Regions:
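S-adenosylmethionine
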Residues: 1-199
Length: 199
């Protein structure tokens, strides 16, 4: 159960060029690709990748920020939120930045997007990813205080909370979960999720 190697899925980043130029570059790099269609996503956004030269993440197109390796399932909440270029959005528990980047893409790199994560190591990874992807409408910090929002109650048009979870939904990519997950860890996740929603 869930023992097979998962597919490598990619989300095109329109901030760094057209999908046609990305596909041309994939062809030059020897990366085979197939479009993945979902009724909730616009065409030409999601692709399954296969590379004969190792990981697609080692490719120049990835380093240039033209795409982000990301499961389609992680994007559904982003599309349900439906952020607009004129809106103010909060992405809580944002690292490593996949959903933040997808939010920015739908906002056309405009509007106001605040991204927070309490883990400084993960926060640096988020900032590195956003820089690679050419995203400019994001302010990030460990909490709202770092974003200068402590003295006033911030008002957002939408809030995305990707709360800490058990990872049972991504066992194909996190094989260690089946061996390390415990009842107490699930209970801790529930408490953290409740605290986040109440805040």
């Amino acid at each position: 159960w869930n023992q097979g190697a998962p597919s490598i899925m990619a989300r095109w980043n329109p901030i760094q060029g057209s999908v046609e130029s990305l596909q041309d570059q994939w062809n030059q790099e020897g990366i085979a690709f197939k479009e993945c269609l979902h009724d909730w996503s616009a065409p030409h956004r999601l692709f399954e990748l296969k590379s004969p030269k190792g990981s697609p993440a080692d490719s120049e197109s990835f380093q240039q920020g033209k795409y982000y390796i990301q499961d389609p399932s992680t994007l559904l909440a982003v599309h349900l939120l439906d952020p607009q270029p004129t809106e103010s959005i909060l992405d809580a528990c944002a690292a490593p930045g996949g959903k933040t980047a997808a939010l920015s893409s739908l906002m056309q790199n405009q509007g106001t997007l605040h991204a927070t994560d309490p883990d400084p190591v993960r926060l640096k990874r988020l900032q590195s990813n956003l820089h690679r992807l050419g995203i400019q409408n994001v302010r990030s910090g460990e909490n709202l205080t770092q974003l200068g929002q402590a003295s006033k109650a911030p008002s957002y048009d939408g809030i995305l909370v990707d709360a800490p979870c058990s990872n049972t939904g991504v066992m194909r990519r996190r094989l260690d979960v089946r061996w390390r997950l415990s009842t107490s860890e699930i209970q801790t996740c529930c408490e953290q999720q409740s605290a986040l929603l109440e805040s």
